[in-house]
Every structure is written in C-alpha cells, then in structure tokens.
Amino acid sequence: FEFNCTAIEVQVDPETGESAWSRWVADGRTRVTKRSDFRTVNGVRFAFLEETEGETARQAQTVTWENVTVNAGLDDARFARPSASASVVRLPAGRKATDWLAVDLHQKRYVYLRGEVNGVATDIVLDSGAGMTVLDGALAKELGLRVEGELEARGTGGNVGAGIVSGVTVKLAGMEVGPLPAAVIDLSGVGRRVGRPLPVILGKEIFHALVVDLDYPGSRIRFLDAASFRYDGPGRKLDLIPAEDGHKSLRLAIEGGEPVVVGLDTGQGGALSVFRHYADERGFLSGRPVSERRGGGVGGATTMKVATLRSVTIAGYELKGVPAAFQATDVRGAFDTKRQEGNLGAGILSRFRVLFDYGRACLWLEPGADLGAPFPKDKSGLVLGWADGALAVEFVAPGSPAAEAGWKEGERVAALDGEPATAEWGRVLTRWSEAKAGTTVRLTLADGTERVLVLKEYY
C-alpha cells in the first residue's frame, strides 16, 4: 500500500499472522526490516528482534526487546502537559521575552548571532531547516565533548555521518538553551562555500520552544515566551504545515499556479529551490535563460540549474523576478523528495520581519521597505572558495561573464576590486550581486595579473 509518497510492502504468514519482513520505499530510498525471535505474550505474538537495513551502513539498526507488556494500561500522568520547568529553554528571570539581539546577516541572508556554547564565545547560525543543533568538529574538540555513536545526517548535498554529543548548553540574548544533544559534523566545507565558518548551527529546537521574532530588515532578533505571546502587528498570517521530523512547510504560488508546499528554511541562502518533479511538471526550465551554479550544504557540493521566475506569491505578497535554483541530479539529499515542491530560503524571507509561532502553526510576515526591490543575482558567474589562506575559483557558470572571459576552475585570486582577498571575500560578491548590469569589476590573480569582468544578468 502507498501513502504520502511512501510505498510499504509487508510479508505476512497466512497461518500464524506473523509479519517477519517489510520494505519501505520513501522518495526512492529503500529500507528493509526483518523480524525474528517471535514470542507469545498474553496471547499476542511479538518479534523480540528487529533488524533494519537501508542504503548505507549508517542506516542499519538492530532493536532487541527485553520486556513486552500487553494491555497493562497507562498512567494518566504520562499524558500531562510538560511543566515550564521541563523546557530546554530558560528566558531571563521574570521575563516573557529577551531584549533585541543584533543579527549579522552574512551576505544579507545567513543569520549569524553571537553567543556562548558551554562557556566559549562563538558565532551561532540560526537554521530552521536543521533537524537538531550541530557543532563543527573543531569546536566539539575544543569543548572537550566526547562523541558517542553515529547517525546519518541528510543535507542538501547528500548524506554524511554525524557523531552525537550530549550536555550542550547555548547562551544568547540573555537566555539559556539546553542541555541539548547535538550532532557533530565537519562543517569546514560548508563554511568555505558560504564564505564564513559555521562553528554552531542552532536548529529547530529553538523554534519549537519559543516564538522567534526575526526582523531581517532591522538586522535584529528576539525570543518570546510562546504561551503568553499574542500578535497585534500589521503583518499577514501564513499557516504552517507539519513536515517530516518536526520541520515545517508552508504554501506559496509560483507564476500564478496553484499554491504548493515548500519547506521553511532560514539556513538556505537562496530565495527558492524548486524540486525536480515540480519543475518538470510546470516546465520552468523551458523558454527562459538557464545557467548553473555550485552550491550545497551538509553532505557536500551539488550543481544546480538556475533561472529567474516571473513571480512568487507568499501570504498574498507578490514578488517579481525571483532567482531560483532547480535540482539537476538526485543526490539522495534533503531536496530529493516528492513530499514537497520546493524549499523557501532566506532570499525571500529576508524581505520581511518574520515571527515564527510553531505552537500556533503559523508565521506572521511584515514586509520591509525593500519588498519590491529587484532581487540580487550573481552577475559574474564565479563561485569562489576560501581554503588554506587563499581564494580560488571552484566553479564557472555556463554563459556567464566569467565563462566568456575564459576563467578556469582552480585559478587563485589575490584581490577583488583592489581589496586583498580575505576570508570575508563574500561581502564583495554580495556587493557585485546588487550592482547594475554593465558594472566593471577587477580581479587580481596570484601572479599579479589583473582581469576585468563586465557584470551582466545571464539567467
């Protein structure tokens, strides 16, 4: 039988009723479970051993039941609402909200906060798309945290192994979050692509525990007690939809089509990613300029198609000329799914002050002054990466000014518009993305050679 893009096949013994084998196929990914060691408990047959295999060794698991009780009843106290003291989040004493905390919007998209993790001052990236809090391996080592076990983390670039640590406490904006379990992943590759290290990613836990008031236009954030929160501002309400593993989705419309379901992801730097099945259905890549870009997050780098959508409508607000990414290949990552039609990122969210109220299953959107401003787009075609103290070309977009000028992957860049290349190189490319077509920019190679690019819109 099938439901929600998942096909389930169950093998049942016609004589005993035992189900010793089942197969789940979700979004093309297969999981097989074998059951054995059947025993009868109060007249009911149970498998005391379950062995599951997936597509990688990390997905394998074995569950052994030591005790099974049948029809014993449950204490009503188990269903009581958790007390406030049980929350993993503690606001400042006597307060229902934190003060405003300044946000460093890296590349005007990624939400960087300053705080502490287990007493160590650090940058913290806020990411509603993260299934749990994540520590970079280098920080986990600095904190002396012991990694135990391994799970498989699924990101936009594919799947990667993640260690698990416990006892992680985060402090920011005068509040305390934790102790939490956290995943430990080598985030150096993601940081290189983003143009800034990601020592800590604070995930969905904070969104479930509090109302998050993220004022993108004002570059500030605060956190409010969810139980006492009441919205009385000028914004529009947008309903949230439960998604896999505690994430949230919402509906928006693309180019006048029927509203479709997309994931809510503050950690995605683009405006909108459109998943392959929906892009094919609507023919979005036909009849318009299309190029490619190198991107990706946890799991590695991926190459995506890029094009400009005529319009995207969210909560009744219509946005024009929206740059979008389209998945070109199936990497078994978070975006390779038919349960959603796309993923909404910071490129659109940053046009608003957004209040995330997961407890009431809604967002409140207040448009900023630049709601109708043209969207920034890459106009050079160069994807750069910072590694080993140098800036290098990692990708050249087809049909872009860089491609026409003969740029090659691996070339090293020493300066951008006369500014020596540093780990903060992303700020210069952000400026270029906002510049008008026809603007001339200069790049100096490691050997001192200077090259000129004339920026243009190529998709």
Residue ranges: model-predicted function:
Residues 1-2:
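Exposed beta-strand-loop-beta-strand "reactive/processing" segments of non-cytosolic proteins
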